[in-house]
Amino acid sequence: MVIEIRPRETVMLAADFQALVTWYQDVLGFAVTDLFEDDYHYCCLETPSGIKIGIASAEEMEVEPADRSTNTVVLQIEVDDLAEFFAHLTEAGGTVTFGPSFEKTNEFWFGGFSDPEGNPVWVVDKNCP
């Protein structure tokens, strides 16, 4: 038996729900597609290219956020020009955690950054296989 699964958003639990939602909107260009604030705080966001994330209140989910730089699940995105993206990110107060570095075998640029709460995000350029 094969059970069909479908994509949904990757969810991040935020210590400061509104601040993290605003950062993903202002810095990375995500748009709010759904917002729930009555019984709990949860926001669905999506980029014009179709990347979906969800942000929820960690406190309401009874989760105490730890050192997020050690997360074993990492969001990865692609941009056309990594140097240009990192310049934008730095100007907007983002934190580049590594890179940009060039992968010689497959000839693409890669790096990483963290959002204001320390969630790691990996970035590759359009040449990444």
Question: How would you name each of these model-derived features?
Answer:
Residues 20-25, 89, 118:
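Conserved active-site tyrosine of GNAT-family acetyltransferases
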Residues 19, 81-86:
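Short, conserved charged micro-motifs
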